[in-house]
Amino acid sequence: RNTGWTPRPCEPILREQKNEQRRTDEGMGDTDRATGGRGGTGDALSEGHDPTVRAEGYRFLTRILVAMTEFQVEQDADAPSLVQIMSPIRKFFVDNPDTLYHRATLNSALRYRIHGRRGEELYLAFCLYGLRGRTNCILANVCDADMQFDDDGRFDLVLSAERPDGVKNWVQLDNIARTLVTRQYFTNLRQKPAELNIELLDEIAPPPAPTVEGITRRLRALSQKIGRAHV
């Protein structure tokens, strides 16, 4: 009779699950320290202030957390989407109350097409951002005065490293470009906004299933964004 111990097939899987949990916990720990941990952003935003200002600081932090979770965890440069940044209950960084903002995550190695139709906005602009060191910089900005529209107000705008032949509206993607922000200005909230859509021009493989490494990387990016909120 063999009484020796033999590893069962499930044990390598269990070990990998424990390793995955550890990596996830590390990512969550970074986020916890950035938000509510002692000495984190929550303390930096509220320390030394009266109770009302402290409460506003923590409310600001919750808004940043909700927004950055959507931007850093859910948005994907391989499946681009324009997400509304501000709303009546999500406002931060001294936004303009007469402006409608949308955001998309980009990959500078890919090509994108924005298409849509003008509404009743007074101003329409597309702004590219990227990190130079630790500073988020404006890399390019194109507004309606720089663009061509058809008689019905429809337009196409291509974002790419090189300008394609025959394209009327184009913005160059710098190799550090990571974010697109659109702005529409209004004088009346009843004015109709522009219709905006974004799509990927390159054919790429379907997105893989989520991995612990990928989610952990996004959680750490989320932590870094939140940690810079008070700077």
Model feature map: region roles:
Residues 5, 10-230:
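A compositional/structural signature for long, glycine/proline-rich flexible linkers
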